[in-house]
């Protein structure tokens, strides 16, 4: 079988160990505590369907099992859902124990590949949504490695303040810097969602230099409105 997950970044890969964790939790009704429950794909499924994590994972597991071979599907259900031993499963199928292990391994590998593709697609779509909200695409940055490191560290530090400012005159790349930090996988996984509101209170004029706006570029009411528009739009 070709590796459908080839080329996918390790950060979004659903490993065989994570699949095994899901299958073992399947028969114990403890799916909500698995690593897969924290994946972006499942979190988005919860947002769309209103299901809890266990229901969402069961639904995805049932869909995925239907794409396995009959032997792989039966082996997976008997071993994990009903908790039978390899010996009993082999007897029930009229197969050797080595065949049961082979079906088990192949099933886990296929589930890992399929779920990795689902997770990778979810991340690609989410990154595109964030770039759309920021009204700009991600682009290479030069000479800002130190600033980017500081910003990423601040966003990942749970002891830091709730509000982190990126200050400077208009046009120096603050939005690009913030976008580059936000698109970091470790940062995106920390938050349920990211909304984007940008305001420019001053701008550079070639004759007059820095010119301040005569009215507030962003009010509290407009901030709340723009945040809600993005959150509601994402759930539509």
Where does each model-flagged region fall?
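N-terminal interaction/assembly modules
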Residues: 1-68, 87, 99, 103-106, ...
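Short amphipathic alpha helix immediately N-terminal
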Residues: 67-85
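Short alpha-helical "recognition helix" segments of helix-turn-helix
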Residues: 88-93
């Amino acid at each position: 079988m070709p590796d459908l997950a080839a080329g996918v970044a390790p950060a979004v890969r659903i490993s065989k160990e994570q699949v095994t964790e899901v299958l073992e939790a399947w028969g114990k009704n403890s799916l909500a505590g698995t690593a897969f429950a924290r994946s972006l794909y499942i979190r988005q499924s919860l947002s769309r369907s209103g299901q809890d994590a266990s229901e969402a994972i069961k639904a995805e597991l049932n869909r995925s099992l239907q794409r396995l071979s009959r032997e792989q599907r039966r082996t997976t259900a008997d071993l994990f859902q009903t908790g039978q031993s390899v010996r009993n499963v082999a007897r029930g199928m009229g197969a050797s124990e080595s065949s049961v292990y082979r079906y088990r391994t192949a099933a886990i590998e296929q589930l890992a590949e399929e779920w990795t593709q689902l997770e990778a697609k979810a991340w690609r779509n989410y990154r595109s949504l964030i770039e759309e909200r920021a009204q700009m695409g991600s682009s290479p940055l030069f000479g800002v490695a130190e600033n980017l490191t500081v910003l990423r560290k601040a966003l990942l530090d749970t002891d830091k303040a709730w509000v982190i400012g990126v200050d400077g005159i208009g046009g120096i790349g603050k939005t690009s810097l913030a976008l580059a930090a936000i698109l970091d996988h470790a940062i995106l996984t920390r938050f349920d969602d990211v909304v984007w509101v940008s305001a420019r209170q001053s701008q550079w004029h070639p004759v007059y230099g820095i010119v301040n706006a005569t009215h507030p570029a962003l009010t509290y009411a407009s901030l709340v409105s723009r945040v809600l528009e993005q959150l509601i739009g994402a759930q539509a």
